Amino acid sequence: MLWKKTFTLENLNQLCSNSAVSHLGIEISAFGEDWIEATMPVDHRTMQPFGVLHGGVSVALAETIGSLAGSLCLEEGKTVVGLDINANHLRPVRSGKVTARATPINLGRNIQVWQIDIRTEENKLCCVSRLTLSVINL
């Protein structure tokens, strides 16, 4: 298994409470051997003035789940910080919720690269993002 830190969905969501993550309604929702997911509502908190999911909020979701994943696959005493993120917005989302899944592309000693795919409730890909993280000591 990829994960080196012990965690539950409950304690991950508790960790994210009282932050931008919880303000946007992001919830860590599932994980497997080499992936982790978070969901986010498409509502007044996450939409742009024209009635669709805000692209910057999609990027916040991607960075949230990718950074969390990056930290969880490191031994205690280490964490990650973002170096670069990009996103391609593929389709507008007007309602419901979206789910972001982070999977590793490369997990080096000093640099990690994560792929984050964001999908609609109908499982349509709406955003793809790539996140580069730097591993640091706490």
Swiss-Prot record:
In alphabetical order, the GO MF annotations are: 1,4-dihydroxy-2-naphthoyl-CoA thioesterase activity
If you read the UniProt record, what top EC class would you report for this enzyme, in one word? hydrolase
What is one term from the GO cellular component aspect held by the record? Answer: cytosol
Q: Does the keyword Magnesium apply?
A: no
Family indicated by similarity: Belongs to the thioesterase PaaI family.
- E.C. no: 3.1.2.-
Q: Which SUPFAM superfamilies match?
A: Thioesterase/thiol ester dehydrase-isomerase
Q: What is this protein called?
A: Putative esterase HI_1161
What are the protein's UniProt keywords? Answer: Hydrolase
Cited Pfam families: 4HBT
Q: Which InterPro entries match?
A: HotDog_dom_sf, PAAI_dom, Thioestr_dom
Q: Which organism is it from?
A: Haemophilus influenzae (strain ATCC 51907 / DSM 11121 / KW20 / Rd)
